[in-house]
């Protein structure tokens, strides 16, 4: 279960972001393309847990190094997206929408966008389509998970990792299923009711020996898991989300990751999806604001042609973000320092504050 570069995981990323992009573009054949986010959650839980577990076991884990790497990997492209959206927002949003947008930016910068959006709207409501940073809710959940997971692994004795992980997984899933009927919006947006999805990935990373022993079982489950990932986004269960559909997709994703089928390393479709997966983070960041700004500017229903053109614009912006921001900052190799994260945060706060003053005039 080595982390390394894995074509199969990159292909899963490519599938996930494709589902989300086509769903947001309004393609009718993807009634549940939003499940791509659930695939992302499992992948993130697996990769982060696998990395931290190995470093803790080797006695070389450092909180400073971990959070520096996360900041360098995630923040530049995200903050570039927030800044570009802030430039466009005054020309596309009315006064109230602009005030809401500024709150969304504050939430995204402070890893609490899911909480801000919970106070503003439900994800599936019509008003949600008008929010340029709606998609940052999932990034905030992942970042909140990254704040908690390393502490759990670093300070908990190894013999309690799996029992503790199972307990938290069951508690989170139970809260999700139990609260879905009563608090659907909160269930959608909050880490306690979404953490189990990242926990699925974490659990297979915490049990590499068991995953090896279960390879015959995983081999039998592999193609049914692939079928789940192919079918459910097209033919959704119609049940409340997150619920049974998310559980099936998360478990299917976990099976594919744990099985590591050699076919996914060689198949042409996997390699094509892996290329998309390489740029999935920038595509995810850049694709949604154009849709939101289009819907804010439209006086009538957005046409399929407009959606297709907007999707192409979003993809183009995502590729530009990848080439000009994400890749250069990933190659940058400074020494970890508190000043990097603090300086980035302060700069972002100054930009947001400047935008607030401009709105207030």
Residue ranges and their predicted role:
Residues 248, 356-361:
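Conserved small/polar residues in nucleotide/adenosyl-binding loops
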Residues 1-337, 348:
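Membrane-interface helix/loop caps of multi-pass membrane proteins
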